[in-house]
Design a protein with these regions (language model features):
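Active-site recognition of the HExxH zinc-binding catalytic motif
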Residues: 9, 142-165, 180-188, 228, ...
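Inter-helical turn/loop segments and adjacent helix faces that build the functional surface
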Residues: 26-30, 52-53, 95-98, 162-170, ...
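Short, glycine/acidic-rich hinge or "gate" loops at secondary-structure transitions
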Residues: 4-7, 50-65, 101-107, 167-174, ...
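Glycine- and acidic
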Residues: 19-33, 66-77, 132-145, 161-174, ...
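Generic structural signal for well-ordered, non-transmembrane alpha-helical segments
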Residues: 33-47, 86, 181-184, 248-252, ...
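Post-HExxH zinc-binding segment in Zn-dependent metallohydrolases
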Residues: 174-203, 210-213, 217, 291
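Contiguous, non-catalytic segments that form substrate-binding/exosite surfaces or channel walls
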Residues: 1-136
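C-terminal, non-catalytic "cap/extension" segments appended to globular domains
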Residues: 4-6, 12-17, 22-27, 55, ...
Length: 373
């Protein structure tokens, strides 16, 4: 019903149904096309983020219900929130020495909710309150590696918001795609830090496992959602779409992205993902792909110019409500995101990280085999 209403409005306005999504994200269709073309060309490589984890568990493909499972290592871990926050603050110093005390302020002010409570759902959500110049993190922290990386994403959002405090409200409307850049870049910094300073092979492998989960969730799975939603809109133009047809569209999109890396599909994906039913956002899926691939691309730039990157990155975030995404990248990073080079650099960084996981997983498995076996 919502899609039919939207399509009728687009018909009257004589516009493509993707146009509002581009406007909301302040990004050009050419940039999104360049991103998606690069990602589609690398789907075979990206599937290794799923297959490599499946092989480590002794299977050739991943069961759908295991896509978000933690690393199957012998030790059980619970990371206290205080420890997780210390790691996140330490990572933040790479960008700004003020980040640790700023994040402490967020906690002291009661702006961060992480408790486990009866009936409280898992997950995390960020909201900036413009009228108060205050960030809010609403979440349930579970003590897992995945939960810690989720907190890093939330603190990345909060830092982005904090950098813009004091600017006029009309200059603080952050495009969704750039919100995801800020959050996902912070998660990447956390992955890098833990892998570099891991006290054991298990800890390093856990961080790599979570990073591959991060890649498959935010690139492959979001690719499924993007293609499915576009296909659904095209079908809805013709009339009412049956449940069977919707399920078939999802299966086709799943197969196109996951290929043979999973055993079956998630049949309820189109039902249980609230992003398909949001009335204020159009196509809230490709911004995650944008944010993730972009974060890896920016990480490559950071390693090439570590001395000047923090200042440039801060100015990039501060100005994210003042100009288009395309213009931001041109001004601060001298990058044309309508061309494939930047996106391909991010995807190559993902490929290298998958290779590192495969190497570490092989070494760990060899050590775990008894000598007399």
């Amino acid at each position: 019903m919502l899609t039919g209403f939207r399509l009728k409005g687009f018909e009257f306005a004589e516009m493509d149904f993707m146009a509002p999504a581009y406007w909301q994200n302040a990004v050009s269709s050419e940039a999104v096309d360049a991103l998606m073309t690069a990602v589609r060309a690398n789907r075979h490589m990206l599937r290794k983020s799923v297959i490599s984890r499946a092989l480590f568990t002794g299977k050739s493909v991943m069961e759908v219900w295991d896509l978000n499972a933690p690393a199957p290592l012998r030790r059980e871990i619970h990371i206290p929130y205080e420890e997780a926050l210390e790691k996140i603050k330490e990572v933040g110093k790479v960008l700004d020495e003020c980040i640790p005390e700023t994040f402490d302020l967020f906690v002291e002010k009661g702006w961060v909710e992480v408790r486990q409570l009866p009936g409280k759902q898992n997950g995390a959500f960020f909201q900036g309150i413009l009228s108060l110049n205050e960030p809010r993190i609403f979440s349930t922290y579970l003590g897992s590696f995945a939960s810690m990386s989720q907190q890093a994403i939330m603190y990345g959002h909060a830092w982005h918001f904090w950098l813009q405090r004091g600017l006029p409200a009309q200059e603080r409307k952050i495009p969704r795609a750039l919100m995801e850049v800020a959050g996902h870049f912070f998660a990447l910094l956390l992955f890098e830090e833990i892998q570099a300073k891991a006290a054991s092979a298990e800890e390093k492998l856990e961080a790599l496992w979570q990073e591959l989960t991060f890649i498959s969730n935010y690139v492959i799975n979001m690719g499924v959602r993007f293609d499915f939603e576009r296909s659904f809109f095209e079908e809805r133009k013709k009339g009412v779409v049956s449940v069977t047809k919707i399920s078939n569209l999802l299966s086709e999109a799943w197969q196109a992205w996951y290929g043979e890396s999973t055993a079956g599909v998630d049949p309820y994906l189109w039902i249980n993902r609230g992003q398909f039913y949001k009335i204020d956002d159009y196509f809230y899926n490709y911004p995650y792909i944008f944010g993730t691939v972009c974060a890896y691309g920016l990480s490559e730039i950071r390693h090439r110019m570590p001395e000047v990157f923090p200042k440039i990155y801060s100015e990039f975030l501060q100005n994210s409500g003042r100009m288009s995404v395309d213009d931001l990248f041109k001004k601060f990073f001298k990058v044309d995101i309508t061309q494939p080079e930047f996106w391909e650099s991010g995807l190559k960084a993902m490929e290298r990280k998958i290779a590192v996981f495969e190497t570490e997983a092989r070494k760990y498995s060899e050590k775990s085999v008894p000598e007399n076996s």
